[in-house]
A protein has these predicted regions:
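Intrinsic low-complexity, intrinsically disordered segments enriched in polar/basic residues
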Residues: 1, 20-21
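Bacterial N-terminal signal peptides that target proteins for export
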Residues: 1-8
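N-terminal signal peptide c-region/cleavage motif recognized by signal peptidases
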Residues: 15-19
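Mitochondrial intermembrane space
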Residues: 21-122
């Protein structure tokens, strides 16, 4: 097999293998700012750019979970992708992560038996 055919086949396998599984994003556990480390303590989901204030409510009051199918469909039609915004203790700085189109759900909260906050979409 020639070098070009091998490269083409490898590229195709790489692209299609990624399409079968949902990409996962997660808020970093900490944010470094000068000499201070800030811990993750909150997260929100937005339809469109966060500066436009299109914050979405979680599915219910007992758990911070967002089911994404309807939001993803609407976002594709309207050109408003989803954004996960990560917030940290004692700073106004945030981390904004674009939610992959393949994601089905986002979750946030405290880890079991822990004070560590988490937020991710997959």
């Amino acid at each position: 097999m020639s070098w070009n055919k091998t490269l083409l086949l490898s590229t195709a396998l790489f692209i299609f293998s990624g399409a079968a599984c949902a990409e996962k994003i997660a808020c970093p556990n900490t944010l470094q700012n000068a000499l201070t480390t800030h811990r993750l303590n909150d997260a929100s989901l937005f339809q469109g750019p966060p500066e436009k204030h299109g914050e979405l409510m979680p599915d219910n009051d007992s758990h911070i979970v967002w089911t994404l199918q309807e939001y993803q469909d609407y976002g594709k039609k309207m050109g408003l992708p989803l954004w996960l915004v990560c917030r940290y203790e004692n700073t106004s700085k945030t981390v904004e992560l674009k939610v992959p189109d393949s994601a089905n759900q986002c979750k946030a909260g405290l880890e079991d038996n822990s004070t560590l906050f988490y937020a991710f979409c997959e």
